[in-house]
Amino acid sequence: MGRYALDMEKYADLARTASAEGCVLLKNDNSTLPLKKGDKVAVFGRMAFHYYKSGLGSGGLVNTRYVVGILDALRACKDIALDEELIGIYEKWIKDHPYDEGEGWGLVPWSQEEMPVTEEMLQTASGDDVALVILGRTAGEDQDNTDKLGSYKLTRTEEDLIRKVSSQFSRTVVILNVGNIIDMKWVREFDPAAVLYAWQGGQEGGNGVCDVLTGRVNPCGKLTDTIAEDISDYPSTSNFGDLQKNYYKEDIYVGYRYFETFAKDKVLYPFGFGLSYTSFSVQASAEEKDEHTVCVKATVKNTGTKPGKEVLEVYAKAPQGVLDTPVRVLCGFAKTKELAAGEEEHITLEIPKNTFASYDDSGVTGHRDCFVLLEGTYTIYVGTDVRMAQKAGSYPQTFTVIEQLEEVCAPQKPFARMTRKPGDVIGYSDTPERIYGPYDRVEKPAEISQTGDKGYRLEDVYDKKISMETFVAQLSDEDLIMLFRGEGMCSPKVTPGTAAAFAGLTPSLRKFRIPAECASDGPSGIRMDCGTKAFSLPNGTLLGCTFNCELVRQLYEMTGLELRLNRVDTLLGPGLNIHRNPLNGRNFEYISEDPFLTGKMGAAQLQGLNIAGSTGTIKHFAANNQETKRHEADSIISVRALREIYLKGFEIAVKEGPARSVMTTYGPVNGVWTAGSYDLNTIVLRKDWGFSGIVMTDWWAKANHEGQPSDPRIHAVMAAAQNDVYMVTADAQDMQQDDMLEEFQKGNLTRGQLQRNAINILQFVLKSPAMLYEMNRISPEELKDRKNAAKDDPDVSKMMKFMADEQGNIRISGDGWDTHQGKEILADLDMKAGSYELQMKVKSNLDDLAQLPVTVYLDNIIKGTLSFRGSKGQWVTQQIRFDTFEGHHYMKLYFGATGLTVDHIAFQLSGGADKEQ
């Protein structure tokens, strides 16, 4: 197998291993797990039949060749026997209570209707050895969780299910197929013997869960979030979900930083917690190695009877002085190899002190806007979760300025933020007055004198025949503006069905041999809306729970090869936002409440992608901590909380990945939309962290001028802030779609700024696979491996193509369509922006009791289901409405039952679309 060949068996094995290592065992009374050889297993819960491989939105829309659910994997396991009679009862009920796909984007149910457990079911399973209760939850992009039954909380039917099954079976295991933590008070009330967080494990997820249940893999996952008694116990809850402003009053006291400092009694399961089928001992010492480093030495021993892995976690406690600090901060971790019973492993971690430095944003230490080490005693704790970590050593520290920075993104007005008072009492103090406005420090780089076309091509820069500046000098002002604009979604200029094309998109730019770059949605796999298959990865939270950077690195090396195979230059991921609150619907994409763990896991993903010569786009920069009104709701945060919590994970990934591409958010931070924030995109990223890649907006992002509302036409402020690529437009050549040319002509956007951004983009291009294709320098080995790759995907080149007429309408005949159950009709539609009515005219010879659903997808997003019934040979028409943007779209019609004849479908344009859909 060649270097660039994608070994799907290895890919699946790595994903399966990650899925298993990310499972977190919270409870296992009387060694209920692992299942014993010969056990007869009763499986309860309808979600056994509907596995959630990922959360909702762009991060989950991966077309897979297969998905292994938990029940699928259990059925394939020869060491146990399933109660098929009980399974049959569920299957019969599900026929009358089908899976509810919801109404489309942002309108999908958080959970599915659960089958009420009956005495008949309990009697059927009465002779079984063990019961598995499988529950599921989903949420995602544009769809936060809510503190309601069926979302964050269990429904009454689910509670009744656990209560009755736990009462009958001494060995009851509750398995949570969820993207995020949920309310867990029911564990104490109903007392099931075992509880397992299985998360959302991608297409190999069911196999991973089965491996843990059967003992093939000893559970070794650890919580990346604190599970508290009640949602109201999280200090962010009272300031989460507002439609206009969310004050981050908890400041740096996020997750365990809050609970371990102020509210230990509110914790059900602490950060870093997770059980094993064996036991371990940890002996550790810590001491100051030098003025920059702390050295931790530990011995982890398997003191039980089964082989297993353990996670060593290191926390620092800073002295409490003029600058308040949490009582614990994660500063290091390591996962052991699999240790046999009685075996031990010696681990040495050298931890830079700047890992646990504190940020002074007020000058209370005499050093405003600095990371500092405080005078006093620093204590190091080592253990297997934040609560069980024991003191391993301490050392005296003199006051030290670690890094002098500058104020960024400061709140417009002071607000009260949480502080730690003597005696670990909660206090509040105002954030400092800001010094700089958002535009006070915007630089206007000197322009490069334009030369016009001198015959140089980008390949000449690659070959070091000319400088990048000499090349960019050839580009006209219009070229520079067009280079700023990406196109999508589903641009025909790059891999079909992907999120965007950018760089060489226009004839004038292509003249200079600038290739079109391809970006695909992630992070849970490659999204290609034309139907091309890709590998669905475990979600971000699950990967974080592995605490295994090397495993994640190896997994994403395979994803990097898959990107190259599909000619995708960057995957839009990993997601590195903080789990500020459990109700954020997009937490499944992100990793943890802790920034250090988030950054290390993000860096591991990037390192894997980079090994394969691909890369990822870390997102969403920064503070995308709720989906409700994400385009408008202002995140009001202190500079200290930004620097220590919400930016830190990005910083680690930028420096250690390294990252080459960053995506900003939709919304504002402290009154300034991040897409146009010079503080974030230039000062923090490039000056403070040394980032040299590209920054792109989120899709159809907006910006503003401070004190003014946002506007989708305001793009010039983005370019001035060094946000290099606007995502996305229908046509990069359209000079009337935004304010770029107008602001350039006014002098508010300079040629030097556009040239600077162009250099950023083109430096990215030079390191991409697309550039190798442009120069015809892809190695013969890679070309051979691509040619030999198995393909069972739709042939996009042969897909039906239709273009809207002058009125924006499209009509497609249904002659010859195969509409048998499970069949699909695919088409490439070139549509205008606006509100469409889709009309579908069909007939059926069946009687009116026949149910004949047709589900309509556009770009892999469900737009609705037409619920036809038998019409006894009469033609009938149904309609659905939706909005869309201008450009190419991939339509799929899925026929849920056999029996329809289609006359035609028609798309009729009725009005302009809101681009913030």
Regions found by a protein language model. Give the residues of each.
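Glycoside hydrolase catalytic-domain context in secreted enzymes
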Residues: 1-388, 409-844, 853-917
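Short beta-strand elements
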Residues: 388-412
